[in-house]
Amino acid sequence: MEILNWQYGITYAILILTFLSSHEFGHYFAARYYGIQTTLPYYIPFPFPIALNFGTMGAVIRIKEPVTSKKALFDIGIAGPIAGFIVCCIFLIIGLETLPGKEYVYQIHPEYLQNGNGEIPMSGLYFGDTLLYSLFSKLFANPNGFLPPMNEIYHYPFLNVGWFGLFVTAMNLLPMGQLDGGHITYSIFGTKGHYAVSRAFFWLLLILGLLGAMYEWYLYLDETNATTILTGFGRSIYLFFQYFFAKFPILKGMWTGWLVWAILAKFVIRLKHPPVENEDDIGTTRKMLGIFALIMLLGSFSINAIYII
């Protein structure tokens, strides 16, 4: 089997392992600080050649004994996202500061020049834009240079891993169950406050996922000309979707995966957080860090995540 662009693959592998390690070792060292026994990170490979494959299903550590205080829970929960977030920001800055010209894309896709006028197609696999990615693009990319569209950034290891790492960080910071964001939210607001926030985010993800599924169904009907055979109620639903997505174009392209996440959160991760033994207040400094965690979540979250046009 011929292997092309192996140097970019090695760069990507090193970067993604660096991100995963920084996140998991953030948890690890915070747990060890409190004398809590924990394993070293387990890295989960995913080598199967499917359409959407980042080469890994992430990494995990296993905490071998209960966390007994809110302060320890908060510190362990937030250490991983902060460490991973910093690494991803560095990756994005490096990637944007060292962007090659448009000819780099043409080397990978010579057909863009051969079959057209050099314009990059608007179709393909897109990575959803985020507040942080947009901000960094304005701050660090050459304003007179070439900024690759979001359906081409997988050719740029630093941008790709930076985006992917922020996406993973955002998912971990969702304030639900025993995700990192759940630990943080529980430590700040307690059982009732955490459960209220957790339910709100469950409904948010469910709605986003359903909107994504609705739009995909609408596109399928439109592209296959199935609307010509729809009658009665089915055609009424199609016409409603047509009006709805024309009226609110921002709702197009929602990630259907949020529906999967909502189901996992409800039935696997669970929305509630188990209580800890010591529920003493975590103090003002940690609550300020909790606000920073919210900023990380909002800056890294993408409602359409990964989608195809």
Protein language model features and the residues they cover:
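Hydrophobic transmembrane alpha-helices and their immediate loop junctions
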Residues: 1-309
